[in-house]
Amino acid sequence: MDNTSSVPWASAASVTCLSLDAKCHSSSAKSTASSISATPESQTMRHIAHTQRCLSRLTSLVALLLIVLPMNFSPAHSCGPGRGLGRHRARNLYPLVLKQTIPNLSEYTNSASGPLEGVIRRDSPKFKDLVPNYNRDILFRDEEGTGADRLMSKRCREKLNLLAYSVMNEWPGIRLLVTESWDEDYHHGQESLHYEGRAVTIATSDRDQSKYGMLARLAVEAGFDWVSYVSRRHIYCSVKSDSSISSHVHGCFTPESTALLESGVRKPLGELSIGDRVLSMTANGQAVYSEVILFMDRNLEQMQNFVQLHTDGGAVLTVTPAHLISVWQPESQKLTFVFADRIEEKNQVLVRDSETGELRPQRVIKVGSVRSKGVVAPLTREGTIVVNSVAASCYAVINSQSLAHWGLAPMRLLSTLEAWLPAKEQLHSSPKVVSSAEQQNGIHWYANALYKVKDYVLPQSWRHD
């Protein structure tokens, strides 16, 4: 992850970019020669179109490099267990003992799999949210013969598939066995996440009980939200509901939260546009204005659970649990970034001083939660933003501000190159341009792609799962 590791690929990328640029200009020259009689306006439009095609190719190349290269880092660099990608674990994993659960909390707490949301029947509206799992590396017992054991929530399927891969790496020739998933026959008492497709009961295909402690550990590493070595005969795992995990997918603020524009005007995040310059923070904790280059998530209708941080100076920040917040460490005199739901009272966050305009530490005096409508996640060129006077990262899920900022480099490059292009409206007959903020509704495609690959390239200790 250090700077020296990026030199080889940067050189290769530069050569490739030069090649692409040469091809694009060569194509442009041929086109110009074949149409000498064309008007200056048509030549300008053709040049813009060629430049945009070069830009698209270049951006795709850089994005591919930044996604693929972390997969080639050694386990020592990534500090990870090495599951997936066929590597052996770089650190020892200890099996769970009988009756042990991880985390050591009630299954229905928010820090584990969360509360029950209601039984799902075949005639329930939520039944369509269950998805079948046809992974050939998993055996499904399916005693009922209805295929019910293949049905589960999307999050449960994602974690189960990761676990199946880990089982094959740990014990070649052995497959993961699912003995129970979604239950429509009420075999598990009155309260069970099996009825919602959020729980699975698992074993190994050889039924070797000596493997079950390690199987439970692999389930924890795969990202299940609650794992219990409840019986010598099987392992029980469950996950948060799909409706609640969006707070773990991307970090967002409420649309009513405000950012300070360079003009001195406070603007609600729900009204921000691409190109707005808002108050942000440098890596050294200095206040600076930075351009909004895209929205990683924007949905003004989505209901969401938020964490609320109250400071002794009266600032209140409302943010999703997985969002990174700047925290000042007075003992070491260092600035760190911590997930919002892991900030405690007496921690110090950076807040803008209304008199000097500088960012100063203020003590957190209360940490609460609230459910509200709408999510907005602007990305600035600096990778940080000051919201409701509190300094925060633009990133979430990954417990590393620098790594997350590095991962969004292609989008910053794209924004820079687009700024060099002639005005896009020259390519259209209508001069009206609709802002990206008005068009976007949902998660940005690039942010979503990074989220999907994180489980394969980052250790669980780096993720907010």
From Swiss-Prot:
It comes from the Eukaryota. Keywords: Autocatalytic cleavage, Calcium, Cell membrane, Cytoplasm, Developmental protein, Hydrolase, Lipoprotein, Membrane, Metal-binding, Morphogen, Nucleus, Palmitate, Protease, Segmentation polarity protein, Signal, Transferase. It is an enzyme of class 3 (hydrolase). A lipid is attached at residue 79 (N-palmitoyl cysteine). GO terms for cellular component: endocytic vesicle; endosome; extracellular space; nucleus; plasma membrane. One of its GO terms (biological process) is morphogenesis of larval imaginal disc epithelium. A lipid is attached at residue 251 (Cholesterol glycine ester). One of its GO terms (molecular function) is patched binding. The record marks 297 as: Involved in cholesterol transfer. Ca(2+) 2 binds at residues 144, 180, 183, 185. The keyword Glycoprotein does not apply. Its main location: nucleus. Ca(2+) 1 binds at residues 143-144, 149, 179-180. It is found in: Nucleus; Cytoplasm. Pfam families: HH_signal, Hint. SUPFAM superfamilies: Hedgehog/DD-peptidase, Hedgehog/intein (Hint) domain. InterPro entries: Hedgehog (IPR001657), Hedgehog_Hint (IPR001767), Hedgehog_sig/DD-Pept_Zn-bd_sf (IPR009045), Hedgehog_Signaling (IPR050387), Hedgehog_signalling_dom (IPR000320), Hint_dom_C (IPR003586), Hint_dom_N (IPR003587), Hint_dom_sf (IPR036844). The record marks 320 as: Involved in auto-cleavage. The record marks 251-252 as: Cleavage. The keyword Cytoplasm applies. Coiled coil: none annotated. The record marks 323 as: Essential for auto-cleavage. Interacts with shf. PANTHER family: HEDGEHOG, PROTEIN HEDGEHOG. Belongs to the hedgehog family. This is Protein hedgehog.
